[in-house]
């Protein structure tokens, strides 16, 4: 018998289940990368919506008033319907506040919508829900770009478009995280989701390059092309997304070690012993360790989420999800971590334009290095948290290093492109690492927490609560940057450093619990002890 071709031998070396999981991994990666691809153009186009006046109109500093040169009549209008100093109404002296309003409109709507999205998503098929969101997102992203071709200069048009786009984009994150968690168990979740979460940076990079290609010649296409890509991926989602392994008769991935307990904050290998609560019977020992309030007494039994035992897993309530240990702390931590990340997402190209005096296209391309650093930061955070089996401690370490790094960034970025490039990579890794870990592995761990008694229906709500709270910070960050930047970019960096410190503060209790509770790092199966 002739030997099978190498390619065929490679294909059959993997099981049917493994091929399906690889397919879902890549599909959800591309689906959410397209969401981020559509969010990036606004930050690239800012430099074109408001730009320095031509030499004939006189010099302009980054914070000077260019509006006087754009109100003298049609002689100052170019063939592409924009003025020498930008696109009305963003050519005025308060352009930073107006551009900040666009960010705030999108992110505030996103934050509010996210709380509702998880609840709605648990009650609808993921494939239909996500398809609708992607088609609508593509339409409203493209609608923003149509303002260029139809010569629209109404601030209200752009703000309303951003609000609706922010609402429909909330369908994405809870859906893809829930789908991926259905297919992948808890083993090496930090590494798997750390790699998978690089879709954020990949989407940002592609969005920057696509938007940058047209920004100086026809900025409307910087929105229309990404919008078309998101809509096309929505059709792909409808045709190919498989919500759960059981839908194609695949097995669900189970934890490798049946005696090892995992909770998303830490993973413990404990001697098999049982504790009891008054009403609920056996309580998982790792859950008891997590619930210890002062090292001696467990918290009130109400902190345990009780679900029906008849096998009919109803969707968890909002308050029930909040009672899962660690949800509130990680949500508040993400609020400040995402504030920092989204400030860079929306304002970094404009900062580079101001400091390094580059045009919008080159600044957009250079800003992608922050996302390149974010890819490595997310993977590194996942690997470290899997190795140490301490999610909160990993986030805390990176947040601790991020604050002084931002200070150095603000100091050396004015020294030339080489210094800016180095600090973009380092800052991207440290800023994006905790953000990536919390929104993926931590959210998935908490959404499948032992206290839920196996109810996977909680995952979408938990993910939405954590990311929704983080999105409040994402809305505040760009808004504050727009208000603070006229007083100097250094003050913006001080604000970001303060936010990192606040994010770390909310993890102190969980870090203390991780370091005080026994774990497998000790190399033995230790009994649960009172501390």
Curated annotation (Swiss-Prot):
Inorganic phosphate and glucose-6-phosphate antiporter. May transport cytoplasmic glucose-6-phosphate into the lumen of the endoplasmic reticulum and translocate inorganic phosphate into the opposite direction. Independent of a lumenal glucose-6-phosphatase. May not play a role in homeostatic regulation of blood glucose levels. The chain crosses the membrane at residues 18-38, 100-120, 129-149, 157-177, 192-214, 222-242, 332-352, 364-384, 392-412, 419-439, 464-484, 488-508. Residues 53-72 are annotated as: Disordered. The keyword Membrane applies. One of its GO terms (cellular component) is endoplasmic reticulum membrane. This is Glucose-6-phosphate exchanger SLC37A1. It is a multi-pass membrane protein. GO terms for biological process: glucose-6-phosphate transport; phosphate ion transmembrane transport. Keywords: Antiport, Endoplasmic reticulum, Membrane, Sugar transport, Transmembrane, Transmembrane helix, Transport. The keyword Transmembrane helix applies. GO terms for molecular function: glucose 6-phosphate:phosphate antiporter activity. Belongs to the major facilitator superfamily. Organophosphate:Pi antiporter (OPA) (TC 2.A.1.4) family. InterPro entries: MFS, MFS_dom, MFS_trans_sf, SLC37A1_2, Sugar_P_transporter. It is found in: Endoplasmic reticulum membrane. Pfam families: MFS_1. It comes from Mus musculus (Mouse). CDD domains: MFS_SLC37A1_2.
């Amino acid at each position: 018998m002739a030997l099978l071709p190498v390619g065929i031998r490679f294909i059959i070396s993997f099981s049917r289940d493994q091929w399906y999981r690889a397919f879902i991994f890549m599909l959800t990666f591309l689906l959410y990368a397209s969401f981020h691809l559509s969010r990036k153009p606004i930050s690239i186009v800012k430099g074109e919506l408001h730009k320095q006046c031509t030499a004939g109109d006189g010099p302009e500093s980054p914070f000077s008033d260019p509006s006087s040169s754009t109100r003298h009549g049609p002689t100052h209008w170019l063939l592409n319907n924009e003025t020498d100093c930008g696109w009305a109404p963003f050519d005025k002296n308060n352009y930073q506040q107006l551009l900040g309003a666009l960010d705030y409109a999108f992110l505030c709507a996103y934050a509010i919508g996210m709380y509702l999205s998880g609840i709605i998503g648990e009650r609808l098929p993921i494939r239909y829900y996500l398809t609708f969101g992607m088609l609508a997102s593509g339409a409203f992203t493209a609608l923003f770009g149509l303002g260029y071709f139809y010569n629209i200069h109404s601030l209200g048009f752009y703000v309303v478009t951003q609000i609706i786009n922010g609402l429909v984009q909330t369908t994405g994150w809870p859906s893809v995280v829930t789908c991926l968690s259905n297919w992948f168990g808890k083993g090496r979740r930090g590494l798997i989701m750390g790699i998978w979460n690089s879709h954020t940076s990949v989407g940002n990079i592609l969005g920057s390059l696509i938007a940058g290609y047209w920004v100086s010649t026809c900025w409307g296409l910087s929105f229309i092309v990404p919008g078309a890509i998101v809509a096309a991926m929505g059709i792909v989602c409808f045709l190919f997304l498989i919500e759960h392994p059981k839908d194609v008769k695949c097995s669900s991935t189970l934890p490798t070690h049946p005696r090892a307990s995992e909770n998303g904050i830490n993973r413990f290998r404990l001697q098999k012993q049982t504790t009891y609560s008054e009403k609920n019977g056996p309580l998982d020992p790792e859950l008891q360790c997590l619930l210890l309030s002062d090292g001696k007494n467990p918290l009130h039994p109400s902190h345990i989420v009780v679900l029906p035992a008849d096998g009919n897993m109803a969707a968890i309530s909002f308050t029930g999800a909040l009672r899962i240990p660690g949800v509130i702390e990680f949500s508040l931590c993400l609020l400040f971590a995402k504030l920092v990340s989204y400030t860079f997402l929306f304002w970094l190209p404009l900062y580079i334009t101001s400091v390094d005096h580059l045009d919008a296209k080159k600044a957009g391309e250079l800003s992608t290095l922050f996302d390149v650093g974010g890819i490595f930061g997310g993977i590194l955070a996942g690997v470290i948290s899997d190795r140490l089996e301490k999610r909160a401690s990993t986030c805390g370490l990176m947040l601790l290093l991020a604050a002084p790094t931002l200070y150095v960034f603000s100091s050396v970025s004015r020294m030339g492109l080489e210094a800016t490039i180095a600090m973009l990579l380092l800052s991207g890794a440290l800023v994006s690492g905790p953000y990536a870990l919390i929104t993926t592995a931590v959210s998935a761990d908490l959404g499948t927490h032992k206290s839920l008694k196996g109810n996977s229906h909680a995952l979408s709500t938990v993910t939405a609560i954590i990311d929704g709270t983080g999105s409040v910070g994402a809305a505040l960050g760009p808004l504050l940057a727009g208000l603070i930047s006229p007083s100097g970019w250094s003050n913006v960096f001080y604000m970001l450093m303060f936010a990192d410190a606040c994010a770390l503060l909310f993890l102190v209790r969980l870090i203390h619990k991780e370091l005080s509770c026994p774990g497998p790092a000790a190399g033995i199966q230790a009994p649960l002890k009172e501390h």
